[in-house]
Every structure is written in structure tokens, then in C-alpha cells.
From Swiss-Prot:
GO cellular component term, pick one: cytosol
Main localisation: cytoplasm
Homology family: Belongs to the class-II aminoacyl-tRNA synthetase family.
Protein's recorded name: Alanine--tRNA ligase
Function description: Catalyzes the attachment of alanine to tRNA(Ala) in a two-step reaction: alanine is first activated by ATP to form Ala-AMP and then transferred to the acceptor end of tRNA(Ala). Also edits incorrectly charged Ser-tRNA(Ala) and Gly-tRNA(Ala) via its editing domain.
Cofactor(s) demanded: Zn(2+)
First-level EC class: ligase
Catalytic activity: tRNA(Ala) + L-alanine + ATP = L-alanyl-tRNA(Ala) + AMP + diphosphate
UniProt xrefs under HAMAP family: Ala_tRNA_synth_B
Record remark on domains: Consists of three domains; the N-terminal catalytic domain, the editing domain and the C-terminal C-Ala domain. The editing domain removes incorrectly charged amino acids, while the C-Ala domain, along with tRNA(Ala), serves as a bridge to cooperatively bring together the editing and aminoacylation centers thus stimulating deacylation of misacylated tRNAs.
Free-text cofactor note: Binds 1 zinc ion per subunit.
GO molecular function, one term: alanine-tRNA ligase activity
Amino acid sequence: MDTAEIRSRFLNHFARRGHTIVPSASLVAQDPTLLLVNAGMVPFKPYFLGDLATPWPRATSVQKVVRTVDIENVGRTARHASFFQMCGNFSFGDYFKAEAIPFAFELLVDGFGFKPDDLWATVYLDDDEAEGIWRELLPAERIQRRGKEDNFWSMGVPGPCGPCSEIYFDRGAAYGREGGPIADEERYLEVWNLVFMQYERGEGAGYDYPILRELPARNIDTGMGLERMATILQGVDNLYEIDISRPVLDLAGQLTGRRYGADPADDVRLRVVADHSRTAAMLIADGVVPSNEGRGYVLRRLLRRAVRDARLLGAREPVMSELFGAIGTAMGPIYPELVDNAETITGVAVAEEASFAETLRTGTTIFDAAVRQVRSTGAATLGGDEAFKLHDTYGFPIDLTLEMAAEAGLSVDEAGFRRLMERQRQTAKADRAARRIGNVDLSAFRPILARSGATTFTGYEELSRESGVVGLVGIADGAGLTVVGEGDEVGVVLDATPFYAESGGQEPDFGLLRFDGGEVEVLDVQRPVPELVLHRVKVRSGELRLGDRVQAEVDENRRRAVSRSHTATHLVHAAFRRALGEGATQAGSLNSPGRLRFDFHALGAVPPSVLTDVEDEINEVALRDLPVRAFVTTQEEARRLGAMALFGEKYGDAVRVVDVGDYARELCGGTHVASSAQLGAVKLLSESSISAGTRRVEGLVGIDAFRYLAREHLLVSQLSTALKARPDELADRVTDIVGRLRDAERELDRLRAAAVLAGAGALAEGAEDVGGVAVVTAEVPAGTSPDDVRLLAMDVRGRLAGRPAVVAVVKADGSSIVVVTDSGARSAGLRAGELVRNSWASLGGKGGGKPDIAQGGGGNSEMIPAVFAKLRGLVAELASR
């Protein structure tokens, strides 16, 4: 049974049982706690949690999935792959265990032909209900109980979870010992996991996590790996050898000069090349590009592992382009984006392959030298400093170094590597302020500090003061200067300054330094070392000399706008802690003129109603005109007073506390308004996730908030006029319009499809007889959708029932072609995929597919006559054999 048939039987089985078939979502997870979709249920997570109303009570899908947590096992076992397709059926508070278990059993036995005697089931330790249901289907001795590690499912991050029941297939004594799944999971192969989604879990490593609550409804989430099922039903040893994977595996062998099956070690690498290249193609098709972080790093790692193994197998030329072509042929019929965007997808992979080839060439030389050095001393461990150099200088990911070292029989000092990485991060953090100023060597400030002492900050009390210039520093080289002139950009250190240096999430002050005969503009203010304030300035006029006296003037409007934002952030922090609990602590912030960004710890999205309540409370506090007071005290006293200290921040013995009346109290070194009424208004604009367990709120303060509200009011007025509705009727009116538009679009789609099919009868009647095969070739308008092109081709084929038939339909601009064949034509050796490759692809296009249907893209209108002629010739040649 081919993979397409397995897929079809699965979906149809559940469609007949009231499930809506839902297309696969993108691999790029919309869930902010995930980089990539790593389970079939991920697109349904909001429905399981009750965050969104469920469009259907039951659903079924075949979802694209990427998992790289076990990447080292890919190619080494029969069941590990980084990309797979997860068949699933889902119930959202509709049915539960009593239906889910028989649904699965019926499909396995009646749909896929499994013998009941070959099936085993496992249930969670205390799940008597599930075991009782299974006992109606299997004997008790083939039902086993297992613990949390095996039979309690979660995605590995906060979210839905629950006990599960797994179904196993006994492959026979040749594959291992008796005793069921508990004894041997190589012999007893898991084919289906039925998750009884009842709970929501919290943060925690491994299996040590809290259960937060029961979900609003008891749900079902099942997962049956399509490739694993194909492995069993096609009678092959592993999922790399099934119908959609074997062509890529064989091509990897051809490109590297190694025959699959000849050498076990080579086979592992060939499987890695085939697996990783397929996963990479699917990721790129969904918009992921290689990078050094996030999902881009996952892609880069996969591509680089594939390239390295291909080269170790003997490939001397790039391989990704050809591999991606084979992947498009194998997977394109199900995922047409692989064909439609083949050029872009392949281009990304080829560029990354070329880049890594140079990295690999240089880095491998350095690695080999390091290995020789270790062996010459009789040691067995590669130093952390060598691993760090490979990573930092040559772009070698640590996992690649670990893998290569293991192959060389060495271990790696990972702890030493991590220490050096942490030191680099700390150095980067400490030096960030200086880098903002320029490439200034921190040693440039030592003589200034020794000569003049620390900079005195007076900006809490004043916005203008006379100060002395105690340091001039070149931005480009950090050199000490004595005089600068018009147009120069330099760093200026004053003995005392009212300018606030960026820190604590507050942006720096801007302003002017005036002196006899000229002035300079202050563009940025940083603390490159704790004791000194460095002003990055541009000389507008005159010459500024070391030792000059200047009038330092802070831009008052900017300072007040930033101060409003900072005070508002304190209120936002306090309001969220009141609304969500003491755990909603600040994780970061940015206070700029009229705008704030506040990051805080929270397990899930903040409901809109809570955001509204928080905003209302903040504005009520502002209207109370509470005094804002700052004072310095000891850490111990500040704690006694209940002042909030920010996680991750370090404080000295003396700390500055900022109070907003009796509402908020925090340790803070920033600038603030004098009273809460000076905020004017606060408008929260958005709430989103920035990482697992961290949310972000952005908002406007003061005149910026008023302007936003005025624009919103004007927009509502304009919409009310345009839609002839009161403001409180707008939502219903827009919903109605959108609904009618959707209905009109559906009707338009129906009419368009009908128009396309209107000519199907005439095309069938005009079929040419080529060697006893009915051949139809047709052009349709360039604007015809790919779905309608396929629909027309299959409709014409249906009208030719009883005669061997080949139907080819191409868009007039040559952008795509679909070829279909019936069983009679296929019996005569006419396979759609080969016809596309030998006609369309041979003349400059790209494409391929299955024996019954294939498609191509990347052509042009000029090649259509030649394609049709070649197609007829191929039919004549093959039909005459």
C-alpha cells in the first residue's frame, strides 16, 4: 500500500465518522512557545486550551512535523526521522476514550489489514478506564501499564497534556525478544498514540512539571506516523525505504558513489543525507531561512549535517540541487509548494551548501590538527578552548565538533567550552554600551578616570549646568584627543553632567553642549565603565578643546516624554502583578519618548479583558495625581518596605527607591515625573509572546496616547459614515460584510470551476487516438488556479472511461502543467510522472509526480507546442511496445 493510499484511508476513515478534514498547517509554529510544529496537535492547541472557539467538534489531519531533539539517532534506527507526517484525529469535548480506542483499532484491523493477534496496547499506570476499553478488543496479557515517561504526553513545554494509550505492532521473533513493548521496542513498534488531553501543564524540565488545571473540556489527540505505518505496510526495514523516501535515498547514493545496502556505516550517512535534505526542503518551503538562531539555526544545522555526510561519503560536487529536485518529485503531489517554489527553495539550500563548504574545509583542517595534538600527548579529550575556537573563529557548531570528536574516539571538554561561551557573553554585555558609542577600547577611559575621577550625575535635580570637558575620545580608534572641530563625531566626558546615560531600559537624553564660539549636539549617552558617562557628540560649530567649560543642556521635551514612559512602566508592572499575581514580574523594558515596552513573566496570553482592566486601573491611578518620590536607602530597608527588585539586576548596598504614591514601589535609577497626573493618558496597544513564559506589552503615554485615541476616534467616525452604522454597530456590520464577501468568493470559485469544466466534454470528444490510447492536450487561461487545472484534467480522464487515456492540461503562460493517466494507460507503461519528466522537464521546465498524476512548473508559453508534440511521441512509442 503506497503512502498516498495510507493517507487517504486514514482521512476517509475519520471523515466517515463525522470528522472535518483539516489541511496541514505550516511548519512555522504560531505558538510562541515553539520554534516549529513538533506534533500533529500543535495547530489545534488554542482549541484544546479553550482560548478559541472550536470550528468543529471533530477534526482529522495529516500534519507536517519537524523534531530534532533526537537528531543523533536519525539514520541509526528504523524509526527516527527529523521530518514526518503525523496522521491524527481530534475531539474537542465531543468524544473521549470509549470512542477513540475503537476508532483506532477498527482502522488498523479493517482499513490496514493488521491481525488483532499482532497488536499490543499500553496505558498509563492508573488508567483503569482505558485498560477496561482495551480488554473488549485485546486479551489482558497484551495490555501493559507504563509510567509518566512513556504514557503521559506533553509537548515538552507548558500547554495541554494527559495520559495516553499507545498501540504497538509485533514484528515477530526475528526482530527481538518476547515480552511486549516493555521488553523490546525494536520488535514491538509503536504505530499510534492516543492522548487523552485532560490537563494543562506548567514549566518544568523533563517530566518534573506541575499540572496547573483541568482543561475546559476532555479532548482527544491522536498521532499515527504516516511514514512509520508505510514502513510496516510496505514491508521494508525502515522509514527511509518507503515509496516517498527511497528515491531520495537512492539518489544520495548515486551522487556520492555509494550503493545503499552495501555497507552499514555508509547506509547511516546516506539516510542522514536523505532525511536532513527532505526536512530542509520542507522548512524552506514554509519560509524558514538559514540563520544562527531560532528555527533558522535548526535549518542550518540540518543542511550542514547533510552536506558534511555527503562529502564524507565521497561527494566532490554540490548535491543539494539534485536532492531537492528528487524531493520535489516525491513530495510535490501532496505539497505543491515544493514544485511551485522549486527555484527559490533550491537556491536557499545551494547558497548555504556553498557557504558551509568553505567553513568545513577550513574548520576540518584546524580540527584535524587539534586531534593530532591531543593524541600526541596521550590524552583523550579535546580541550574546551579548541572547541571554542572552532565555534567562534570558524563557525563550527559545537554539536558538529562533538560528533567529529566522537568519530575520532575523543571526548570534548564541554564544560570548558560553556565557560568560554559564558565569558564571551558577559564580555559582550559589559562592552555593549561602548560598542553603541563606537569601537572604543575601554582602556581609553582609564587615564581619564585616574586624572579626573568619576562623572557626577546631576540630572535628577537639573536639566542644565556648567561642566568641564575632562576627556575627548575618538570614536573610531579610542585615541585620546585634545581638540575637535566642526563635523567631527567624538566621545566627550564631563566632570559632571545632567545627561542620563542609557540604562535600566530607559533611553538616553539628547541635547546640546554650548561653549564660547560653538556648540555640539549630543546624540547618545552611555556608561562604558560604571564611573564615567560618555556623550557621543557631533560638533556643529567651533572648536572644542580638552579643559573647556561647556553649558550642558538636556532636551527638556524628550526627557519629560521618556520620564512619563518610565513612570507609566512602573504602573503597568504594579497593575499586572495585581491582575495576574505576584509571579508577573518584569523581565525587561524599554522607555522611549511617549512609548513603553514592558516584558513580564506569564504562562499564557493575557486575556483582552485583563488588558482592558489593567489599562483602566493605570489611568485611574494617573487621575489620582499621586506624588512620585525617589529616595536612597539600604537594600535591607528597601526590602522591608516592599520595594520590587528586578530579576537579574545587581544592586549595591545603597539603592534608590521610586514610589508612586501607595500604588507602586520599585528599586530604580531612572528619571520620573513629579506626579502621576503628569502622565496624561496611557494606552496599551498590544500584548504578545517573545519567548516561552515571557509576554510583552507595548503602549503609548501622554500626548502620543492622546493623538492615537484621536486618530482612532476619527477612524471610527469615518467607518460609521461609510458603513451607515453607529459606532457600537460597526463590529456586527463588518462581520456581516465579511460573511457576504466570503459567500460571494465561494460562489465565484464555484462558477470559475464550472466554467473550467464546461469544456471538459468537448475535450474528451476531441481526444486523439495515439496507438490505441486516448490523448487529450489542452490549454487553459493563465489565471486558472492550480486546483482547477487538476480538476479539469481528472474530469476529462473520467469522461474517457473504458479507454486507456492520457490527459495533459497546461496553463497558457506555461507556468504549470498537470498530466493524468488512467489504469489502462499505466498498464501500457504510461506513467504520469515519467511523461512529465520526459516532456515538460526535458524542455526546460521542472516537475514529476506519481504514475497516476504529476505536475510541473517553471515553463513558458513558447514551449507548450513542443511539449504536447513530445508527449504524443512518448505515448506512441510506449503504447507500441
